[in-house]
């Protein structure tokens, strides 16, 4: 009997323990995530990787959002928009940040975040292709990416143009279609205006045609359900970034300097990369001293078009167009020696960087330094004070850039310490260097991708050579 009671007590205890475990499982809160997983697409203005690290508008915003949430950022690139959608619906990613526009179709599938920037949808064709006067004349000649906002636009246009048809590419992104346009493989596509502006630096043959949709918001996509907290956090973050000027800064950083396009200049620069840059690249890399060598090379191209014998009526000479006093200051004896010129230019540019106030953030210091290289640090400091007097941020390049042209107007320059300066030229100077730099980065990335593609082929060829029987070996002579 006692034994039976002991067994019953033991069973009761086990049942009680099981009950506690079940109750604990019910009340234990879900584990807090440690990562923000962001689905994206590769693209110059979206997300790309290089020897200098990760970059892109959406990447920078995602990095800031992850920091705001105190989470580790994980960028997860996909091959196309369809795969992005599938990953979101399966719960593989938390958010889509891929330069996608706000459309009715996307509103039906996802929750849309606040607008980051706005774009026009434009018809794109190659120089020499007949200029399209209306979309309805291009039956079957337009190619767009599957699931893109351009499909929605064409579907809408089809209601008033029933004969309008187009081709869709599932396995090619918008940039690949622009490449096909430049190569003459397809006649027409549709692109966002920002994407076209950026890609024309690398493919100057691209031309802008009809504007099909104006000022379309670019947004992030969130899951349609169970995303209330994430949406609330995103809205709070967006308001902070907008008030602080971060959104405006990123828009200026990625888009403002590419709006000015010069076909002849772009073609000449791409030719110079092939014909002239190889002579001096190692020297740029050697003397960059902490500066990205491509920024130094871009500066030299803006100064002299990489001509070591360049001269100007004002007395500046050489590849980096140094004045005589500047050459003496940096210890250069022969300004027409390209290697001395690069060394001196790098030293002078670094000195401009060092003399800038600490209040200027690292990401913008180079633009201030380049403006100082062009018109002098004193004039740039005048522009900073002028910006501050107008309620602008003297340490934000976008704000100082907006007031630099005022240094040419008597109303403003007579109140400054250093007087008149051609501020509009400094703005153009910096914007041009930024465009040249972006082109060099893009070409570097393309070369890196090409090398990665070639490695498996080279490995396979080497393995095949090793396994091949040596039929051509020298045979010993017969006696």
Swiss-Prot record:
Top enzyme category: lyase
Catalytic activity, EC: 4.2.2.n1
Subcellular localization(s) per the UniProt record: Cell outer membrane
GO MF entry, a single one: peptidoglycan lytic transglycosylase activity
Disordered: region residues: 457-479
Signal peptide range: 1-15
KW Lipid metabolism (keyword) present: no
Catalyzed reactions: Exolytic cleavage of the (1->4)-beta-glycosidic linkage between N-acetylmuramic acid (MurNAc) and N-acetylglucosamine (GlcNAc) residues in peptidoglycan, from either the reducing or the non-reducing ends of the peptidoglycan chains, with concomitant formation of a 1,6-anhydrobond in the MurNAc residue
Biased composition (Basic and acidic residues): 461-470
Keyword Transferase included in the entry's annotation: no
Main localisation: membrane
Listed PROSITE patterns: PROKAR_LIPOPROTEIN
Ranges for region Non-LT domain: 16-258
Family statement: In the N-terminal section; belongs to the bacterial solute-binding protein 3 family.
HAMAP family assigned: MltF
PANTHER family: MEMBRANE-BOUND LYTIC MUREIN TRANSGLYCOSYLASE F (PTHR35936:SF32)
Function of the protein: Murein-degrading enzyme that degrades murein glycan strands and insoluble, high-molecular weight murein sacculi, with the concomitant formation of a 1,6-anhydromuramoyl product. Lytic transglycosylases (LTs) play an integral role in the metabolism of the peptidoglycan (PG) sacculus. Their lytic action creates space within the PG sacculus to allow for its expansion as well as for the insertion of various structures such as secretion systems and flagella.
The protein, known as: Membrane-bound lytic murein transglycosylase F
Native species: Shewanella pealeana (strain ATCC 700345 / ANG-SQ1)
